[in-house]
């Protein structure tokens, strides 16, 4: 039975959280009540608690920018913006803080974070849930962008990104 993308993300994040107590997951609706808009975080809040898996306000600049502070105190956040269309308010933080920290500090302050941005999801999301933003974010120096085509690649990309000191 093939594993769908959503399950691959869930399994990868669960394995990372089981192995590393500094791993956090937060973002829009990933907490206990919903477990992600696509259920990609289902059961994680129950398993790891509200201190490690929690919802944030719908404030993408905060979600992305907070990873700088979380990394500075030794945590390794995995954050999610619900849909690619929603990333725009957070681009300033991604471009000016997250992407440059490791290089500006000569490796002293890496931002160990993963930013998950679901894109190309099933259904018809209309003009505000269906955009492709990769042509913009791939031009930001200092971050890596992965666009998996199957569940195995997604799981591998998440786990590889987690151990990379760059965002």
Question: Where in the sequence are the language-model features?
Answer:
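Thiamine diphosphate
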Residues: 1-166
